[in-house]
């Protein structure tokens, strides 16, 4: 193989690796977003339960969005 052919093959490998890497990053970001949404929902439910308990609400008014 000539030098030009080897350089062309090298560029094709680099391009293919970059495209695969970018696609994997997007898929990974989607999984992270789904996990973050689940965590946010869990936190919201926990805060609602916490704020529905009068002793907790009175001792932590800033967390429940009101001032005594």
From Swiss-Prot:
It holds the Pfam family Toxin_8. Expressed by the venom duct. One of its GO terms (molecular function) is toxin activity. It is found in: Secreted. Disulfide bonds join 51-64. It comes from the Eukaryota. One of its GO terms (cellular component) is host cell postsynaptic membrane. Keywords: Acetylcholine receptor inhibiting toxin, Disulfide bond, Ion channel impairing toxin, Neurotoxin, Postsynaptic neurotoxin, Secreted, Signal, Toxin. Residues 22-49 form a propeptide. Residues 1-21 form the signal peptide. Its main location: secreted. The mature peptide contains 3 cysteine residues. Alpha-conotoxins act on postsynaptic membranes, they bind to the nicotinic acetylcholine receptors (nAChR) and thus inhibit them. Belongs to the conotoxin A superfamily. The cysteine framework is C-C-C. This is Putative alpha-conotoxin Qc alphaL-1.
């Amino acid at each position: 193989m000539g030098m030009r052919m080897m350089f062309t093959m090298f560029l094709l490998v680099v391009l293919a690796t970059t495209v695969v890497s970018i696609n994997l990053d997007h898929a990974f970001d989607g999984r992270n977003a789904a996990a973050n949404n689940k965590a946010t929902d869990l936190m919201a439910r926990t805060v609602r339960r916490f704020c529905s308990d009068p002793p907790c609400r009175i001792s932590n008014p800033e967390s429940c969005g009101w001032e005594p």
